[in-house]
Amino acid sequence: MNGSLIHILTRPRMMLMIWGGIGALFLIYVMASAAVQSANRPGANGPAYAVGAKPVRDPKLLIGDMAKFSYAFSPRRAPATQFNDDAEGSPVRLTDFSGKAILVNFWATWCAPCRKELPSLDALQQRLGGEQFEVVLVAADPKGRTAAQAMLTKLGVSAPTALMDEKLALASAVGGAAALPLTVIYDASGNEVGRLLGEADWASDEAIAIVNRVIGPENESVLMP
């Protein structure tokens, strides 16, 4: 019996089948290993998951007003949509801010929650704005630049970059034309970190902590006084 089995297993066709099966298993192993390495490579799935030893997307930071902040766990890039292209402005794209983290806030003059949170965004820019981070206010408002600037002046908001999206081109591109205010944070590579729909206190320690985690660990001790 054993002799017959050995004879069958040593036939050329059977040998080819055996070695073919071994080769297929080896190929599956190589492909699986490559997939795991690719998934674990920094930046392979959109925004970096960690700055230093701390994760950028940290559920522990979602407290207070920031409990409404939603991390972007699927890759989303800052759209290259042109905006600020009204008669008085120069065309701008979010990609123009590449190299620094940005907080983009969509607001309008008719939006009461927007008006309430704008001073806190001004305070955030004054505290953290610089080479690594910038607050960008985008007025998604058909009333136009004059009305938007008058409202900012009335509220005493002057520190952030103020731009227009009168035709809602950018707001639509980020999926936020339906409701305001909407705030979206992008890292220095143009990857969306997350967004918050509705009013928030962006001068709070909780907001500062989220922004600092995106900027880098060297800034994490910086809190509002």
Question: PLM features: residue spans?
Answer:
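Active-site acidic short loop of glycosyltransferases
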Residues: 98-99, 130, 157-159
